[in-house]
Amino acid sequence: MVIANNPILKGFYPDPSICRKGDDFYLVCSSFVYAPGVPIFHTKDLAHFEQIGNILDRESQLPLSGDISRGIFAPTIREHNGIFYMITTNVSSGGNFIVTAKDPAGPWSEPYYLGEDEAPGIDPSLFFDDDGKCYYVGTRPNPDGVRYNGDWEIWVQELDLEQMKLVGPSMAIWKGALKDVIWPEGPHLYKKDGYYYLLHAEAGTSFEHAISVARSKELFKWFEGCPRNPIFTHRNLGKDYPVCNVGHADLVDDINGNWYMVMLASRPCKGKCSLGRETFLAKVIWEDGWPVVNPGVGRLTDEVEMDLPEYRFSKEITTKDKMTFEETVLDDRFVGIERRSEDFYSLTDNPGFLRLKLRPEAIENTGNPSYLGIRQKTHSFRASCGLKFTPAKDNECAGMVLFQNNENHLELLVVKKKDKLQFKVGPVIKGTKIRLATFDISSGDLEIILEAANQLANIYIKKNNEKILVAECIDLSPYTTEESGGFVGCTIGLYASSNGKTSDNYCDYSYFTVEEV
């Protein structure tokens, strides 16, 4: 017996997809313009997870550009005859593609692009039928003309795995459970007891989000909806309920025949979401040929008790991320924007430190700044880092950033102002930079501390074991999805820049920790 605590993956791990091989489960999530892309997790008990890598871990697999909410949308992972398949959409470049691996920890292949004309739309998934044939299921705009925003349909077509090409006719099989519903998306196909089941989300990935299901005896036929659709949602629970935006789900069974659903949902704080959309778990039973989610409860629960043996990992995903830099390979939890390249960081130039190189790219612009972040996982947290940095010119800076997107983030930086060194607290809100507080410092050898709770933050520096308050009660609501828009949650990370000019300077970090308090 094991108990999982929801969300099972905290922080912005949206659009979860899961598969099982034996008693091992593998789960993937969207990554947008963060790189490396598509984090992959392993679990045996659906309660405790380890990250075994990032599927798109090299630039040749992951051409990215544009807004932070572009890039990789809604991956699906499946296993068939010893081969793992991950299919997803890169909305920045190339559209829908597949990568494969014999080991889910990698290496994964180069992308097989399906063609933006041949495979239009987003949210692709794969289904392997009993005869071994593989089928693509995805979403696309109404081919007869989009009548309203979100007027899309779900379609299916055979996929030739030898050529990695779609073959034969394509057919629309569903448009969503409710009349004129918007954004039928995240489709997945399953086969059970002689029926093909189509699970999907609809109504958009916000408060009205919902999960519906349809079925058919034949794959190439219009599906019939469950009479109880939508089968799962939180939109009926009101805006003060602690979990909202529930949708985009995937089903999996265990070796004992028990069924589960993973799905995304959000946990707002003071009515706003800085964590993005997280991964939750629910039990599923089948009644009268249809799935019932969390029977007798009908909503997500804080705990999920399962008849599986507990299995723990030495490097388990928790709400404490403590990074020290004795290793020569960067931790998989760190992500960059567009690229995570040794062009701008090193773990060997100064052993025991992470060195970030100052480059012209600035974090308030789209592009690839010298930034390495990890996901914010809780509303009440403490983030801190130790750094050694001496800016040579007024344009140089380094420190720590709470990042929502290019136009909305909180900069905590060591800077030079004429002949003085300063620590600067600088919110960036809707593209406007604000100098909220500064503190003169004698050197750039210090610790930066951010303590947050209830959408407010206090900022400290620590020098010679003295903790100094620099700014207090900073409003963090500008860094929420409701204020900033987009599809991502916050990351917190290390940052260095020469702001438009070339530089040979760098910042060395001794540690970086983000932990729940």
From Swiss-Prot:
InterPro entries: ConA-like_dom_sf (IPR013320), GH43_C2 (IPR041542), Glyco_hydro_43 (IPR006710), Glyco_hydro_beta-prop_sf (IPR023296), Glycosyl_Hydrlase_43 (IPR051795). The active site is at D15, E185. It catalyses: Hydrolysis of (1->4)-beta-D-xylans, to remove successive D-xylose residues from the non-reducing termini; Hydrolysis of terminal non-reducing alpha-L-arabinofuranoside residues in alpha-L-arabinosides. It comes from the Bacteria. CDD domains: GH43_XynB-like (cd18617). The record marks D123 as: Important for catalytic activity, responsible for pKa modulation of the active site Glu and correct orientation of both the proton donor and substrate. Keywords: Carbohydrate metabolism, Glycosidase, Hydrolase, Multifunctional enzyme, Polysaccharide degradation, Xylan degradation. Its EC number is 3.2.1.37, 3.2.1.55. One of its GO terms (biological process) is xylan catabolic process. Transmembrane segments: none annotated. GO terms for molecular function: alpha-L-arabinofuranosidase activity; xylan 1,4-beta-xylosidase activity. The keyword Coiled coil does not apply. Belongs to the glycosyl hydrolase 43 family. Has a 1.6-fold higher activity as an arabinosidase than as a beta-xylosidase when tested on the substrates nitrophenyl-beta-D-xylopyranoside and P-nitrophenyl-alpha-L-arabinofuranoside. PANTHER family: BETA-XYLOSIDASE, BETA-XYLOSIDASE-RELATED. This is Xylosidase/arabinosidase. It comes from Butyrivibrio fibrisolvens. The lineage of its organism: Bacteria, Bacillati, Bacillota, Clostridia, Lachnospirales. The gene is xylB.
